[in-house]
Amino acid sequence: MADSTARTVKDVNPHEFVKAYSAHLKRSGKMELPEWVDIVKTARFKELPPYDPDWYYTRAASIARKIYLRQGIGVGGFQKIYGGRQRNGSRPPHFCKSSGAISRNILQQLQKMGIIDVDPKGGRLITSQGRRDLDQVAGRVDVTIA
C-alpha cells in the first residue's frame, strides 16, 4: 500500500489497531477507570478477572472499533459480542452473555470523550471527531503484508 493514501480503520489489522488505540486511550488520560476494574469478572461464565492490567483500555478500543464499523450497537449487542460458552460441569454448555455494566460504563466514557454519541433509533454511533481520531491512530499502525 502506498504511503500517500489515507488509511482508515478498515484498512489495518484489527488486532494491531486495537493495541494501538488502547495505548492511545491510556496515554491521553481522558478515560477514568472505575474502582472495581481490577476485581471484576468480564462475564458470568468467567472464573477469574482478566490477567492484563490494561484490559479496560483494550475493551474500550475494541468497542470503539466495532461502533466505527457497525453503527447502532447498544449494550445488549455488546453483551452478545463478548459473550461466550458457560460450562455447566456434567450438564451441557450454553451461551451466556457478558457483563452489561462494563459495556455500559465504557460506552458512557467514550460518549463523555466525544468519540461516540447516542443514536435516536437506538444504540450508539460514532461522531465525526471520533472517526477522525480512530483514523489518525489507524494511519500510525504499520501495515505489513504477510
Curated annotation (Swiss-Prot):
Biological processes, Gene Ontology terms: ribosomal small subunit assembly; translation
S-S bridge residues: none
GO cellular component: cytosolic small ribosomal subunit
Molecular function terms, GO-annotated: RNA binding; structural constituent of ribosome
InterPro entries to which the protein is assigned, alphabetical: Ribosomal_eS19, Ribosomal_eS19_CS, WH-like_DNA-bd_sf, WH_DNA-bd_sf
Keyword annotations from UniProtKB, A to Z: Ribonucleoprotein, Ribosomal protein
Xref: PROSITE patterns: RIBOSOMAL_S19E (PS00628)
Keyword Ribosomal protein set for record: yes
Record PANTHER family: 40S RIBOSOMAL PROTEIN S19
Family: Belongs to the eukaryotic ribosomal protein eS19 family.
Protein name per the record: Small ribosomal subunit protein eS19
